[in-house]
């Protein structure tokens, strides 16, 4: 048995040039785990708190020296000497040290960094890749990628209201083939946009962010790109949306400012029904606001048997909010973001609860990412079946895809790529 010898936190930069927390956990035998914490742009009101310094004279107030100090001065002395293999006990200790509902005292960024680095140190100590350490012999399902290839909303400076237009290579036979298909469509989309004299600058997650007239224009451009790449929309490559509707919600209405429209929840649902009828859309994330439980119930009644309805801001990876959603029959899928709840154990608990209720799970990055690939391992460890980690561009996104290629190679014939089945409908 090797115990925790040292825990060390530092401030590094994420993909948006903002500071974030990185933590190293060192064990007595020399094993070391390192984890860097991501950060979101469109954040749910019910997420665990990311601690920022607020000192405007340093990184425009976005420094994380306080969170780093909490790792080094508060957490480290309490955890050093403990058993790293008892992840639930480590995470319980972290939660108790913080003592708040939302991890606002020490910061979810400090807590998650320690939680993940600890699991990675333990995995290294026993000579296992993280996915196998967490998931055992049953960890064998590669996730279908949801590739965000066209951006609007909070992730881009343009007039498209829907935040993410994604492609899912559901017709692929392996993860490697899925990555190839998605990448070919991505390059094809660039050519389509260039022909229309539209911008091919990329957003936070690697997707293009052209100024289009409407959401329908975005969908048509992607359909064109899929066909030009030699694939059949729906059969080979399906479409998925992240509306991030909480960002559009004010005074009980949804404001689609790019299109100059204001809609009620019922009108939004009718709008989605129309889109699903016209395009091969298999998944809609955050179609309604995180506060609009009644609307979510109706949306699920109308579309829940046809497509995947993913709760992100609605659930914020929180078992208590997920339990309410299950009880009230809201959504049929949960987006899992490690930093929304703040510890690995709570994340795994949320995934377990979702699976028991028949909800699908999608492991997700944040718009502010790092080269850390922990989420790729978590996706395989829990057989999530789906991963959302951006376009096949920008190293912090591609790092996750490349790690999944390595994992698929390592799994060999035991590895499974679920394709259409990942959606569970």
From Swiss-Prot:
<dbReference type="Pfam" id="PF03952">
    <property type="entry name" value="Enolase_N"/>
</dbReference>
<feature type="binding site">
    <location>
        <position position="388"/>
    </location>
    <ligand>
        <name>(2R)-2-phosphoglycerate</name>
    </ligand>
</feature>
<dbReference type="GO" id="GO:0006096">
    <property type="term" value="P:glycolytic process"/>
</dbReference>
<dbReference type="Pfam" id="PF00113">
    <property type="entry name" value="Enolase_C"/>
</dbReference>
<feature type="binding site">
    <location>
        <position position="367"/>
    </location>
    <ligand>
        <name>(2R)-2-phosphoglycerate</name>
    </ligand>
</feature>
<feature type="binding site">
    <location>
        <position position="163"/>
    </location>
    <ligand>
        <name>(2R)-2-phosphoglycerate</name>
    </ligand>
</feature>
<comment type="similarity">
    <text>Belongs to the enolase family.</text>
</comment>
<feature type="binding site">
    <location>
        <position position="366"/>
    </location>
    <ligand>
        <name>(2R)-2-phosphoglycerate</name>
    </ligand>
</feature>
<feature type="binding site">
    <location>
        <position position="337"/>
    </location>
    <ligand>
        <name>(2R)-2-phosphoglycerate</name>
    </ligand>
</feature>
<feature type="binding site">
    <location>
        <position position="312"/>
    </location>
    <ligand>
        <name>Mg(2+)</name>
    </ligand>
</feature>
<keyword id="KW-0963">Cytoplasm</keyword>
<comment type="pathway">
    <text>Carbohydrate degradation; glycolysis; pyruvate from D-glyceraldehyde 3-phosphate: step 4/5.</text>
</comment>
<dbReference type="InterPro" id="IPR020811">
    <property type="entry name" value="Enolase_N"/>
</dbReference>
<dbReference type="InterPro" id="IPR020810">
    <property type="entry name" value="Enolase_C"/>
</dbReference>
<dbReference type="GO" id="GO:0009986">
    <property type="term" value="C:cell surface"/>
</dbReference>
<keyword id="KW-0460">Magnesium</keyword>
<dbReference type="GO" id="GO:0005576">
    <property type="term" value="C:extracellular region"/>
</dbReference>
<dbReference type="InterPro" id="IPR020809">
    <property type="entry name" value="Enolase_CS"/>
</dbReference>
<dbReference type="InterPro" id="IPR036849">
    <property type="entry name" value="Enolase-like_C_sf"/>
</dbReference>
<keyword id="KW-0324">Glycolysis</keyword>
<dbReference type="GO" id="GO:0000015">
    <property type="term" value="C:phosphopyruvate hydratase complex"/>
</dbReference>
<feature type="active site" description="Proton donor">
    <location>
        <position position="205"/>
    </location>
</feature>
<dbReference type="GO" id="GO:0004634">
    <property type="term" value="F:phosphopyruvate hydratase activity"/>
</dbReference>
<feature type="binding site">
    <location>
        <position position="242"/>
    </location>
    <ligand>
        <name>Mg(2+)</name>
    </ligand>
</feature>
<comment type="function">
    <text>Catalyzes the reversible conversion of 2-phosphoglycerate (2-PG) into phosphoenolpyruvate (PEP). It is essential for the degradation of carbohydrates via glycolysis.</text>
</comment>
<dbReference type="GO" id="GO:0000287">
    <property type="term" value="F:magnesium ion binding"/>
</dbReference>
<feature type="binding site">
    <location>
        <position position="285"/>
    </location>
    <ligand>
        <name>Mg(2+)</name>
    </ligand>
</feature>
<feature type="active site" description="Proton acceptor">
    <location>
        <position position="337"/>
    </location>
</feature>
<keyword id="KW-0479">Metal-binding</keyword>
<keyword id="KW-0964">Secreted</keyword>
<dbReference type="InterPro" id="IPR029017">
    <property type="entry name" value="Enolase-like_N"/>
</dbReference>
<protein>
    <recommendedName>
        <fullName>Enolase 2</fullName>
        <ecNumber>4.2.1.11</ecNumber>
    </recommendedName>
</protein>
<dbReference type="InterPro" id="IPR000941">
    <property type="entry name" value="Enolase"/>
</dbReference>
<keyword id="KW-0456">Lyase</keyword>
